[in-house]
Amino acid sequence: KTKITDYANAINENTVMLMKVHQSNFSIEGFSEDVAYENLKLLADQNNLLDYYDLGSGYIPKLPYNLGNREHSLSEILECSPSLISFSGDKLFGSVQAGIIAGRADLIAKLKKNQLLRMLRVDKITLSLLEESIKAYLKEEYEQIPTLWLLFRSVEELSQRALMFQEKIGADYCEIIQSETYMGGGTLPNRRFPTIALHIKGKATTLEKKFRKAHVIGRIENEQFLLDFRTILPSVEEKLITIIETIIGKK
């Protein structure tokens, strides 16, 4: 349990900043407590200190399936005028792998002068790709962000794609099941939401090895090998069908 009084009691003449780190890839269930960023920000302001939120992953649009109920969006946090906030360019933001720091202009200017930036700065290609992602956000063209597009797909859409697979492969070899999935990648730990999966019939462990050799990652659930349709892009569907047919012996 971490309370705001723990922060307050730790402040002394050497304190410069109060920091909060998001639980990106784990969660503590049961009798636990942490400090809301708003309360940390207020305490920092009251003591003339900087505040820094290491968000890990950040999102902008309202998330489906109530996934954002316990997570602040980037917009909500920035409205609090944080001294500094950092988050990943990939993960929920859905762009290239990069670290993004936002906050007070004077603090950002100081960070730019740090010699470590010469080693950590990204190249022009990364910046240009990140720029295109940000443009998509500004235009609210979320379908241009593959991570968000997959996340926002309805169960009905996924069911239609799975049915197409089953019709081509054959019901004797696979079945469509309702399942639950996770965002993964250090985001929204233990937050499950609905998906549709294709159960490839056969021994699960053997199938997993064969698909992995073909560079296809599925998962084993209830001793069944599953392909999660919330992870399948339209551009790879035909190739994936060919791989499935090859592995199960239809080709």
Model-predicted segments: where are they?
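Conserved C-terminal alpha-helix-loop-beta "cap" of PLP-dependent enzymes
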Residues: S159-S235
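Conserved PLP-enzyme active-site core in the AAT-like
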Residues: K1-K135
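A common structural junction motif
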Residues: M119, R212-R219, T246-K251
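Short, low-order "capping/linker" segments at domain edges
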Residues: I232-I244
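Composition- and surface-driven signal marking solvent-exposed, interaction-prone regions
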Residues: N114-Q115, N222, L240-I243
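Short, glycine- and charge-enriched coil/turn segments that flank and shape catalytic ligand pockets
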Residues: Q46, G170-D172, T205, T246-K251
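Short acidic (Asp/Glu) and glycine-rich catalytic loops that position anionic groups and cofactors
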Residues: G56-S57, D106-K112, L138-T147, P189-R192, ...
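Conserved PLP-dependent catalytic core of the aminotransferase class-I/II
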Residues: K124-L127, E131-G184
